[in-house]
């Protein structure tokens, strides 16, 4: 009887551990992106989403970032305007990812994808 109780306790513990480890944090949620301005000038961004919408984020100060915003998954075009010059970056956004679109001091753009799971 004792071995049966131990087995049942072990089985329940194993089942609980397995269920917790297999839980995904993200349930096919839309991607989210933000602009990080590590440059020396204010930056404004126009975002053309994969579903045809256009979003503007204006005057992101140097040393700051915008908040994350959700977009439809797919190819998204970011046009950054710094001192009247346009810089473009096209990014394939996937569900369950955050994206950091960063501008460096030379106005180079880098993209980092962060898995939400």
Functional labels for PLM-detected ranges:
Residues 33-39:
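Asparagine-centered strand-capping/turn motif at beta-strand->loop junctions
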Residues 83-110:
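Structured interaction patches on ligand/partner-binding surfaces of diverse proteins
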């Amino acid at each position: 009887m004792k071995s049966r109780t131990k087995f049942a306790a072990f089985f329940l513990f194993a089942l609980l551990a397995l269920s917790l480890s297999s839980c995904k944090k993200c349930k096919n949620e839309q991607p989210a992106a933000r602009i990080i301005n590590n440059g020396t000038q204010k930056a404004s961004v126009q975002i053309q989403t994969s579903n045809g919408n256009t979003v503007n984020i204006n005057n992101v100060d140097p040393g700051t970032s915008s908040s994350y915003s959700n977009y439809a998954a797919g190819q998204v075009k970011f046009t950054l305007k710094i001192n009247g010059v346009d810089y473009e970056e096209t990014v394939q956004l996937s569900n369950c990812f955050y994206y950091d679109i960063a501008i460096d001091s030379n106005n180079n753009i880098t993209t980092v994808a962060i898995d939400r799971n």
